[in-house]
A protein has these predicted regions:
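Alpha-helix boundary/capping detector
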Residues: 97-99, 241-248, 257, 277
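Short, intrinsically disordered/low-complexity patches at protein termini
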Residues: 104, 239, 252-255, 275-276
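Short, aromatic-rich amphipathic segments at membrane interfaces
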Residues: 198, 205, 230-253
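Charge-biased C-terminal accessory regions appended to nucleic-acid-, cytoskeletal NTPase
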Residues: 218, 242-244, 263
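Intrinsically disordered or highly flexible coil/loop and linker segments, enriched in small
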Residues: 224-231, 263
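Hydrophobic alpha-helical transmembrane segments of integral membrane proteins
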Residues: 256-257, 263
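Juxtamembrane interface at the cytosolic side of transmembrane helices
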Residues: 263-277
């Protein structure tokens, strides 16, 4: 995966400024609410008219994070305190109702995928909502969603799953793109995903799912790379996927193009930048 030309660096924005040559930040399942200073740096990062991107991944293990949630809502993204669960046994993977296939609703970030027929999965996902479709210079769109037979289960009901009864059905949003447009035609964006487990090593290396292909396409598209030959590590066959809901991130994210990744505090902020030619 190193062959996809991404390099990794780490920095703490809680104690230093975000480097100017960072293009993409990946923030995975923080468990502590960021302070206002960090959020101000993120806001400046996305407001400098330089086509910057924040990829945010939620997780069902996260507590309530009011400052972070308010920050995302300003961009039109709400992360709900529940879990997506599949009610149709034919769509369940590994006999786990929290693990099922995901539908691509919007192909804006899938241009360089090699095969969109291979299923994508967002296990142990939190549902997302669009707070608005457009608000001045910000617009939102749904990228991924669950099936029509999924439901959502509140956190407090998960311990009593056998006695739980679905009250509403999907599809539910699992990925939302929020884009801020500038006067010169440039944009900055936040892409929020409901599942950090979708980045697990088991899924990214599995030939049964297109997660690695999808995320590589997302980064290729956001960093305006064209004519890219993707090199993806695949494990073929029906091996068991050892998934859990811990904050899982592929610490090299090195399979995705050459962009430094920066780890911030609890839940990892990962920053990406293109290598200078």
């Amino acid at each position: 995966m190193e062959n996809n030309n991404f390099e990794v660096v780490s920095v703490s924005p809680a104690t230093e400024e975000i480097p100017e040559d960072i293009d993409v930040l990946i923030w995975v399942a923080p468990i502590n609410d960021p302070d206002q200073d960090v959020l101000d740096k993120l806001d400046a990062f996305l407001s400098d008219n330089e086509e910057k991107t924040l990829l945010y991944f939620a997780d069902t293990t996260q507590p309530v994070l009011p400052r972070l949630e308010a920050f995302l809502e300003k961009w039109g993204i709400a992360v709900e305190p529940s879990s997506v669960i599949e009610t149709d046994n034919r769509k369940i993977i590994n006999s786990n109702p929290y693990f099922s296939t995901t539908q691509i609703e919007n192909t804006e970030l899938t241009d360089t995928m090699t095969d969109i027929s291979i299923p994508l999965t967002m296990p142990f996902a939190r549902p997302l909502d669009t707070v608005f479709e457009t608000n001045m210079d910000i617009s939102t769109s749904v990228l991924l969603q669950s099936s029509e037979t999924t439901s959502v289960i509140p956190y407090e009901s998960e311990s009593d799953l056998e006695n739980w009864t679905p009250e509403e059905y999907g599809p539910f949003s699992l990925a939302i793109l929020s884009k801020k447009s500038f006067e010169d035609g440039k944009t900055s964006q936040i892409v929020a995903y409901g599942s950090s487990v979708s980045l697990s090593d088991s899924l990214l290396s599995s030939g049964s799912f297109s997660n690695a292909d999808y995320y590589l396409s997302v980064l290729n598209t956001l960093t305006h790379r064209e004519n890219v030959i993707a090199i993806q590590s695949k494990t073929l066959g029906g091996q068991e996927l050892g998934l859990n809901t811990a904050q899982v991130f592929l610490i090299g994210l090195s399979f995705m193009i050459a962009v430094p990744i920066i780890t911030l505090g609890f839940g990892m902020y990962l920053w990406l930048k293109r290598r200078n030619a």
